[in-house]
């Protein structure tokens, strides 16, 4: 066979690695079968193929003498067919019936779509968490606003109490500055003399003077009873 002569001439040279790919029908769950095709180069028909998963042998197949590849069919639900990276390798018999193995192929990953109910549940939980976070944020904002309004109300009440107290003090101070100008009533000199038991004389009448006030209408001082409340 041509490949036997090639191997004999190559000696210890490595055999080219095969190609690997996932073929349809593709699995939609872990219960569905997995189909993986492994193909050797054109000069190596009828080779023996080995499928690996994580360094462990999963399945062995031999290609027909006129074909250069095989398709591995891994039944669903089997412990040997979980999802994960797969590699394949092929081997041929060289001169003196010595087995020659190729390099490992590139990895192929098999993943399963997430079930719909899990997706719906995840979205529901995420929405509930976002809603809860939003409610907590709104509650904190409302509480902060209420505390601020309550503080403003307390400040206003304290300010008005201080103003009323200051107004009372100022009213008391105003009474000290109020001038009471009352004019004493005039009395007849004769009446005064009668009370004193003496006869009024012109000189006495002239010496008596009517009391007068220094101001007929004193003005009330102007001031403000309101003070700025910080």
Swiss-Prot record:
Residues 20-117 are extracellular. It is a single-pass type I membrane protein. This is Protein HIDE1. Glycans are attached at residues 48, 97. Keywords: Glycoprotein, Membrane, Signal, Transmembrane, Transmembrane helix. Residues 1-19 form the signal peptide. The keyword RNA-binding does not apply. The keyword Lyase does not apply. Residues 139-230 are cytoplasmic. The gene is HIDE1. It is found in: Membrane. GO terms for cellular component: membrane. Residues 186-230 are annotated as: Disordered. Residues 212-230 have a biased composition (Low complexity). It holds the Pfam family Ig_C19orf38. Its main location: membrane.
């Amino acid at each position: 066979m041509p490949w036997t002569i090639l191997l004999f001439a190559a000696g210890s040279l490595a055999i080219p690695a095969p190609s690997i790919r996932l073929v349809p029908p593709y699995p939609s769950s872990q219960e569905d079968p997995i189909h993986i095709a492994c193909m050797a180069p054109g000069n190596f028909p009828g080779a023996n193929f080995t499928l690996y998963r994580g360094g462990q042998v999963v399945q062995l197949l031999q290609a027909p003498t006129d074909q250069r590849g095989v398709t591995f069919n891994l039944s669903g639900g089997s412990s040997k067919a979980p999802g994960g990276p797969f590699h394949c390798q092929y081997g041929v018999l060289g001169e003196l019936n010595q087995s020659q193995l190729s390099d490992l192929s590139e990895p192929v990953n098999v993943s399963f779509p997430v079930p719909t109910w899990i997706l719906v549940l995840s979205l529901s939980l995420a929405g509930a968490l976002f809603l809860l976070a939003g409610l907590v944020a709104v509650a904190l904002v409302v509480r902060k606003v209420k505390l601020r309004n309550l503080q403003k109300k307390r400040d206003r009440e304290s300010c008005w109490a201080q103003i009323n107290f200051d107004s009372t003090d100022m009213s008391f101070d105003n009474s000290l500055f109020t001038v009471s100008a009352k004019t004493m009533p005039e009395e007849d000199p004769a009446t005064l003399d009668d009370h004193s038991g003496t006869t009024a004389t012109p000189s006495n009448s002239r010496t008596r003077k009517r009391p007068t006030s220094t101001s007929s209408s004193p003005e009330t001082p102007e001031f403000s009873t309101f003070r700025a409340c910080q």
